[in-house]
UniProtKB/Swiss-Prot annotation:
GO biological process, one term: mRNA splicing, via spliceosome
InterPro entries: G-protein_beta_WD-40_rep (IPR020472), WD40/YVTN_repeat-like_dom_sf (IPR015943), WD40_repeat_dom_sf (IPR036322), WD40_rpt (IPR001680), WD_repeat_multifunction (IPR051179)
Protein name: Proteasomal ATPase-associated factor 1
UniProt KW keywords: Acetylation, Proteasome, Repeat, WD repeat
GO molecular function: U4 snRNA binding; U6 snRNA binding
Record function comment: Inhibits proteasome 26S assembly and activity by impairing the association of the 19S regulatory complex with the 20S core. Protects SUPT6H from proteasomal degradation.
Family: Belongs to the WD repeat PAAF1/RPN14 family.
Length: 392
């Protein structure tokens, strides 16, 4: 992770023709950047280009959609993946959020063009348009069933939609500012929202009622995450008897990524604080990796890994560039992160190289969603990209 490798965003097209070239660079912190290039020496019988690297770089392996390159001087290597397919017809403008259903069949996305749409994950074909929010939709996600969608908008409303007929079945009102992120508790009888009004609220989907303000922190809540706590963590007990409408909140932690540089963690049912961590800049996003490990990303490009049992000192801080960390997602034995400079990368515990998802050219990648070995990203350039991971 020490010295990120970067590559020309359209390297796969560039290296498909004879003598085609693509640039390459290595960025060791505090040292001069190393620049290099890849050159296509011809196309093999299998349709795979034969590629050589300039001095200081080595091509370890190449396929039609991936190239594994290392920089021995800095002892780093990255496997760059080109998109398997790109969907350009879902939206006309920047795509702010996306999710894939639990069965992998459907995608949902929201855009700066004001729309929220459900589409077929295999080919990007439009299925439904979800209309009803005033102003932009900030976040959208499927419930675990894959048949229902939860969305939050700048109109301070949370809505629940049927993916089958696009009807809005529930609207939650109570926030006084735009909703920036949501999380689903357990199987989805309850949901959590974080807002620009500085509050995180717990909602009862069945009665479309607010079950309580879980946190009121006076600062915009940019990201929320709910996770099951490890048995060793004392979540505290609630001061009042929880409503019988609260379902699945016990033994859960709530994580809040705040604009005031604070990362807040509390017991979801107990409402009791677990820790408050101060970072280098505004926190944009957060996720749980396990019952005690979590990740949170900041506006100045830091990814903090913290242990809830000892949150004062980060387990590690990953910094690859100063670009804002836009999204974080737990994936297999590691995570996927996306940043405001178009980089999107996968870190796995047992891999000694980073997997880079390429294609975005300096445009922020706002959100990542996965289904099995497929990874979907959405970007300011208005494209949804689908990547196919070979065996990790």
């Amino acid at each position: 992770m020490a010295a990120p490798l970067r590559i020309q965003s359209d390297w796969a097209q560039a290296l498909r023709k004879d003598e085609g070239e693509a640039w390459l660079s290595c960025h060791p912190p505090g040292k001069p950047t190393l620049y290099g290039s890849l050159t296509c020496q011809g196309i093999g019988l299998d349709g795979i280009p034969e590629v050589t690297a300039s001095e200081g770089f080595i091509v370890n392996e190449i396929n039609k959609k991936s190239i594994h390159v290392s920089c021995p001087k800095e002892n780093v290597s990255s496997k760059f993946l080109a998109p398997y397919t790109t969907f350009s017809r879902i939206h006309t403008k920047s795509i702010t959020c996306l999710d894939i259903s639990s069965g992998g069949g459907l995608g949902v996305s929201s855009s700066a063009d004001g729309s929220m749409k459900i589409w077929q994950a295999s080919n990007g074909e439009l299925r439904r348009v979800l209309e009803g929010h005033v102003f932009d939709v900030n976040c959208c996600r499927f419930f675990p069933s894959g048949l229902v969608v939860l969305s939050g908008g700048m109109d301070a409303q949370l809505k629940i939609w049927s993916a089958e007929d696009a009807s809005c079945v529930v609207t939650f009102k109570g926030h006084k500012g735009g909703i920036l992120d949501t999380a689903i508790v357990d199987r989805g009888k309850n949901v959590v929202s974080g807002s620009r009004d500085g509050t995180a609220r717990l909602w009862d989907c069945g009665r479309s009622a607010c079950l309580g303000v879980i946190a009121d922190c006076g600062s915009s809540i940019n990201g929320v995450a709910v996770g099951a706590a490890d048995n060793s963590i004392n979540l505290g007990s609630p001061e009042q008897m929880p409503s019988e409408r609260e379902v699945g909140t016990e033994s859960k932690m709530l994580l809040l990524a705040r604009e005031d540089k604070k990362l807040q963690c509390l017991g979801l049912q107990s409402r009791q604080p677990l820790f408050l961590f101060i970072g280098s800049d505004a926190f944009n996003c957060c996720t749980f990796l396990s019952g005690f490990l979590l990740l949170a990303g900041t506006q100045d490009g830091n990814i903090y890994q913290l242990d809830v049992r000892n949150p004062r000192t980060p387990v590690q801080v990953i910094h690859r560039s100063g670009a804002p960390v836009m999204s974080l997602l737990s994936f297999r034995d590691g995570f996927i992160a996306s940043q405001g400079d178009g980089s999107c990368f996968i870190v796995q515990q047992d891999l000694d190289y980073v997997i880079e998802l390429t294609g975005a050219d300096c445009d922020p990648v706002y959100k990542v969603a996965t289904w099995e070995k497929q990874i979907y990203t959405c970007c300011r350039d208005g494209l949804v990209r689908r990547y196919q991971l070979s065996d990790l």
